[in-house]
A protein has these predicted regions:
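Short beta-strand motif preference
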Residues: 82-84, 197
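Extreme N-terminal basic, low-complexity initiation segments
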Residues: 1-13
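Local cysteine-cluster metal-coordination motifs and their immediate loop/turn environment
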Residues: 85-100
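Flexible, acidic/Gly-rich N-terminal and inter-domain linker regions that tether
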Residues: 15, 22-81, 129
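Conserved non-cysteine loop/helix-boundary elements of the Radical SAM core domain that shape
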Residues: 100-273
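Divalent metal-dependent hydrolysis catalytic cores, especially in the metallo-beta-lactamase
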Residues: 81, 94, 170
Length: 273
C-alpha cells in the first residue's frame, strides 16, 4: 500500500518506458511522436523508481514513527493517489521482476488482503484530514486474482476511510488469461475506469519462452468486454528484449496491439533481475 501526492510520479507506472498514444493508422503516429533529443537524453540504464525511499535506502532510521510523521505533515488540502500492491499470481511469468509470488490457493491472498486493508486504515488515521483521493491504482502481481467480492470490498473500504472523489481514476492491472466477462462487469460496477493489460508479445514462440501463453484472441476478447461495460481507457504493456524476438516480429506485435486501439501502449525494455 503506497500513497503519493497527486501529480507526483506514480510508483506503478514510472518505469523507464516509451508511452505511445494510439490513433489513426497503426504506424503513422509513431514517427511524429519520436524526438531524437529525448531518445538521447533518456537512453541510459537507471534504477526503477518504485518507491520512496528506494529499497537500498531503507534503514532502522526509517521506521513506523518516521512514516507517521511524514503522513501527518502532508497538506490536508492536497489530493492524493493510492497504490495497492497485490503480491500474488496464479503462475510466474519468467521475464517478470515484480515483487510477487505464485499460489494455487486463495487463503494466502485473503490473508494478505486483510493485512493490506488494515494498513490502509492505519494510514488514513495518520493523515491530517480525511483527504481527497483522485487516483487509485491496483498493481501486482495480479490484482485480478482477487475474487470479485474481495475486489469490491477493497474499494468500499477505501471509500470508507478516504474521500475518494466521484471523478477519481481507478486503474487495475488486468490479466486477460484469468478474467472472464463476469469479473470485468464486477470491476466496472465497483468503479474501475482504466485497465492496464499485460501483453508483452503476441508471438507464440516468445510467449512460450517467457511462460505467458496469451493468444491474441484472449486479449481482444477482454478488451471487448471492457468497452462493453464502459471501461474505455485501456493501456497495453509490450516488452522488447525477450527471447526469440526480432525487429520484424516486434513490429508485428506493435501492429496487432495498435489495431486493438488502446488508449496507450507502454513499451518496456526487458530488465534481467
Amino acid at each position: 500500500f503506497a500513497l503519493a501526492p497527486r501529480g507526483a510520479p506514480h510508483p506503478a507506472t514510472n518505469f523507464p518506458a516509451a508511452i505511445v498514444a494510439i490513433g489513426g493508422h497503426p504506424r503513422a503516429p509513431y514517427a511524429s511522436l519520436m524526438r531524437e533529443d529525448l531518445i538521447q537524453r533518456y537512453d541510459m540504464a537507471v534504477p526503477r523508481y518504485t518507491s520512496y525511499p528506494t529499497a537500498p535506502h531503507f534503514s532502522p532510521a526509517v521506521n513506523g514513527e518516521t512514516y507517521a510523521r511524514w503522513l501527518a505533515a502532508l497538506d490536508p488540502a492536497a489530493p492524493l493517489s493510492l497504490y495497492l500492491h497485490i503480491a500474488y499470481c496464479a503462475e510466474m511469468c519468467w521475464f517478470c521482476g515484480c515483487h510477487t509470488k505464485a499460489t494455487r490457493k486463495y487463503a494466502p491472498v485473503a490473508d494478505y488482503l486483510d493485512a493490506l486493508l488494515e494498513e490502509a486504515r492505519l494510514v488514513a488515521r495518520a493523515l491530517p484530514a480525511r483527504m481527497r483521493i483522485g487516483h487509485i491504482h491496483f498493481g501486482g502481481g495480479s490484482p485480478t486474482l482477487l475474487t470479485p467480492g474481495d475486489f469490491g470490498r477493497t474499494l468500499a473500504h477505501l471509500r470508507e476511510h478516504y474521500n475518494v472523489t466521484l471523478d477519481a481514476e481507478i486503474a487495475v492491472e488486468l490479466d486477460p488469461r484469468t478474467a472472464d466477462e463476469a469479473y470485468v462487469a464486477a470491476m466496472a460496477r465497483a468503479g474501475v475506469t482504466r485497465a492496464s493489460i499485460g501483453v508483452q508479445d503476441f508471438d507464440a514462440r516468445v510467449q512460450k519462452a517467457i511462460n505467458r501463453i496469451q493468444p491474441h484472441d484472449v486479449t481482444a476478447r477482454v478488451i471487448g468486454w471492457l468497452r462493453a461495460h464502459g471501461v474505455s481507457a485501456i493501456n497495453m504493456d509490450l516488452c522488447y528484449g525477450l527471447p526469440y524476438q526480432t525487429v520484424a516480429s516486434l513490429l508485428g506485435t506493435v501492429d496487432k496491439a495498435a489495431a486493438l486501439a488502446p488508449s496507450r501502449i507502454a513499451l518496456f525494455g526487458y530488465a534481467h533481475v
